[in-house]
Amino acid sequence: MGDPRKPRKKWSPPGHPWVKERLIEEMKLMGEYGLRNKREIWIAAAMLRRYRHRARELLALPAEVREKEEKALLKRLYDLGLVDENATLDDVLSLTVRDLLERRLQTVVYKKGLAKSIYHARQLVTHGHIAINGRRVTSPGYIVRRDEEELIGYAPTSPYFKKAQQ
């Protein structure tokens, strides 16, 4: 079964390593979202793949059977901020990697104006200057839920917090 301290990887690399269009698109995403490496894109793609796969499975079920599970999936994606409140499974199937990258803590910190650039946002997060509801989060890849979005700010122990108070 494997060592529980070493969990199974949650991503898979692309099937063919040298597709020019994909490489160009990945480089654009890395620059736009300040990602450290392409693995972060592949992790987002794997998460998205799982949600889309689940949506396709639900579409194959009869309507009366899938209703409960469909609501659960749509509620989960709504809470993550990926779809609107009255979304359908077609909206889940139309999600892109960009939609998921927009929900990363690093991106949300930059969009809120707490950082000067997307790279600065990554550094603030990894150095422990950003907190969600007063609790420090040091993972730039943390997917911010819809209800946590307004709770993001500087950590109370951060020098940025003291500057923001003045």
From Swiss-Prot:
Annotated PROSITE patterns: RIBOSOMAL_S4 (PS00632), S4 (PS50889)
Molecular function via GO: rRNA binding; structural constituent of ribosome
Ranges for domain S4 RNA-binding: 103-165
Quaternary context: Part of the 30S ribosomal subunit. Contacts protein S5. The interaction surface between S4 and S5 is involved in control of translational fidelity.
Record protein name field: Small ribosomal subunit protein uS4
GO biological process: ribosomal small subunit biogenesis; translation
Top-level taxon: Archaea
Protein's organism: Ignicoccus hospitalis (strain KIN4/I / DSM 18386 / JCM 14125)
Function: One of the primary rRNA binding proteins, it binds directly to 16S rRNA where it nucleates assembly of the body of the 30S subunit. With S5 and S12 plays an important role in translational accuracy.
CDD domains with a match to the protein in the record: S4 (cd00165)
GO CC terms, sorted: small ribosomal subunit
Family named by the database record: Belongs to the universal ribosomal protein uS4 family.
NCBIfam families in UniProt: PRK04051.1, uS4_arch
Keywords annotated in UniProt: Ribonucleoprotein, Ribosomal protein, RNA-binding, rRNA-binding
Any Pfam family the entry gives: S4
